[in-house]
Regions:
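N-terminal Lys/Arg-rich, disordered targeting/topogenic segments
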Residues: 1-11
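Interdomain regulatory linker/hinge segments that flank or connect interaction modules
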Residues: 2, 14, 24, 33-36, ...
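Solvent-exposed, low-complexity, repeat-rich "mucin-like" stalks and linkers
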Residues: 13-17, 27-74
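Serine endopeptidase catalytic core focused on the charge-relay Asp
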Residues: 20, 212, 216-390, 394, ...
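Conserved PDZ fold ligand-binding element
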Residues: 73-82, 159-182, 401-404, 408-413
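PDZ domains, with a preference for the canonical peptide-binding region formed by the helix
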Residues: 82-96, 172-201, 207, 418-420, ...
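PDZ-domain C-terminal substructure recognizer with occasional recognition of PDZ-binding tails
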Residues: 103-121, 173, 185-227
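A short glycine-leucine-enriched loop at secondary-structure breakpoints
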Residues: 155-169, 192, 391-395
């Protein structure tokens, strides 16, 4: 009896040990980098015809392409199912279109179905041109409050009392859409003369809101006021990144335009770009970024309009083609997985209107599955540019980055502590913002794939 019980407990302990071992293995797998990477597998990817997308898959996955109208092949074989374990897997486009790639764990457990779009090759004319940017906001932006000295010698703050704060955007007053500082002042003064309050529609990050303010007669201006400073437009100098030669769609700056006082993004109602000339350079140094001193020229001669102010710059249509002495013909774009750490060049203007090529180095690549800024870390290596400007300065935003004869991105920011270094954004995101290629859905930043350098076949 005791021997049977002992045998039973030994068997039970053995089974418990095996169960604990299996549970531990499952937990270890779930918390492993490989599982976290697999969990972040995107549902939708794009490749350009002529590219070979090379992936490092760090787990035993079976990769197969659907049999219907396949536009890609795996590992240089049509309609092939392969099992990848810590070795590269390549997806090679064979024609334009859309395919479905299926991933299975251990070749058995269905895990994810990924849609792959094969896009036509895209060629753009590189920029580098110095441009003047004039952007008019949707509504007017509140940039400050100011007490109003009344006829009774007292200070009143009607706008502040109504809850209006810096950064608010005034969309309309008394139901009338407003577009300029002058229009705002006239409506408020007219309401005050008629002894009426003003109903103000505000736009805020969390939505729209109506507030009511009572205009008071200002003893200094003899006009009715509510004590606000507003701005209806922004202007500055930047750099053209590229344009598409057929449609004349362009991209510039590489980052969003914000109001200088509130740092709030400006909703684009309308805008224009004009030619600008660089008349001087404020040299950049550690802790003090430099700046291009630009002057608008031929303001009546518009280069194009501005239809979008986004996280990745401004976009619109050029009225005519802009010549580029450095690149007279359109050149291909490189998707982010083609970008390599190493030498590259940037195009920008540092004197007059002459576009120059300067050597830089791409030092870090932050591969992104969803649109994010600061995808590239770059460093100026050209002694001519360092001597002239100290490195990257304000006004260089949008300067195209070219590597191996392809546009890979644009300069966006300078490091305050090191003006020879800064950030750039991938051209992928700029093309999506411009509408040249459709946007893809935002996915988790966690990755199944460790993207290796892609090979490109012309």
């Amino acid at each position: 009896m005791e021997e049977n019980m002992l045998r039973f407990y030994r068997l039970l302990n053995k089974r418990l040990f095996m169960a604990m071992l299996i549970i531990s293995a499952i937990f270890a797998f779930c918390f492993s980098p490989q599982f976290r990477n697999i969990y972040g597998l995107p549902m939708h990817i794009r490749v350009i015809e002529g590219e070979t997308a090379l992936f490092e898959v760090n787990f035993p996955l079976t990769v197969s392409v659907n049999h219907d109208n396949a536009s890609i092949r795996v590992q240089n074989h049509d309609l092939l199912s392969i099992t990848a374990l810590s070795r590269p897997v390549s997806l090679e486009p064979v024609k334009l279109g859309q395919s479905t790639v299926e991933f299975k764990l251990f070749g058995v457990i269905p895990f994810r179905t990924v849609q792959v779009d094969v896009l036509p090759p895209i060629k753009l004319i590189p920029g580098g041109h110095s441009i003047g940017v004039v952007l008019r906001s949707q509504g007017v932006i509140v940039v400050g409050n100011s007490p109003v000295l009344t006829m009774q010698g007292q200070y009143a703050t009607p706008a502040k009392d109504a809850g209006i704060i810096v950064g608010d955007v005034i969309i309309s007053i008394n139901g009338t859409p407003v577009q300029s500082e002058t229009q705002v002042a006239e409506i408020i003064d007219d309401s005050g003369k008629n002894h009426r309050n003003v109903d103000i529609l505000l736009k805020r990050p969390d939505g729209q809101q109506h507030v009511t303010a009572t205009p008071v007669l200002c003893s200094e201006t003899k006009r009715y006021r509510i004590g606000l400073f507003v701005r209806d437009s922004a202007a500055g100098v930047g750099t053209l990144s590229f344009y598409e030669p057929e449609s004349k769609i362009y991209g510039a700056l590489g980052h969003i335009i914000t109001d200088s006082d509130t740092n709030q993004p400006i909703d684009c109602e309308q805008g224009k770009i004009v030619l600008a000339t660089v008349s001087g350079i404020q040299h950049g140094k550690r802790g003090h970024p430099g700046e291009k001193i630009g002057v608008f020229i031929e303001e009546d001669h518009l280069l194009g309009n501005i239809t979008k102010n986004s996280q990745f710059g401004i976009y619109g249509h050029l009225n005519a083609a802009l010549p580029n002495d450095k690149y007279a013909q359109a050149i291909p774009v490189a998707s982010m997985s083609q970008v390599q750490i190493g030498p590259a060049e940037m195009l920008t203007v540092v004197d007059g209107q002459t576009i120059d090529q300067f050597a830089i180095e791409i030092q870090k690549i932050n591969l992104q599955e969803a649109p994010e800024s600061k995808g590239l870390v770059i460093k100026v290596t050209d002694p001519r540019l360092i001597e002239k400007t100290g490195g990257i300065v304000q006004g260089m935003s949008g300067s195209p980055i070219i590597q191996n004869g392809k546009i890979v991105g644009a300069v966006t920011h300078v490091f305050v502590h090191d003006p020879t270094s800064g950030y750039g954004c991938f051209v992928d995101w700029m093309l999506m913002e411009s509408g040249i290629i459709p946007k893809k859905e935002r996915h988790s930043a966690r990755k199944l794939f460790t993207f290796s350098r892609q090979f490109f076949f012309d």
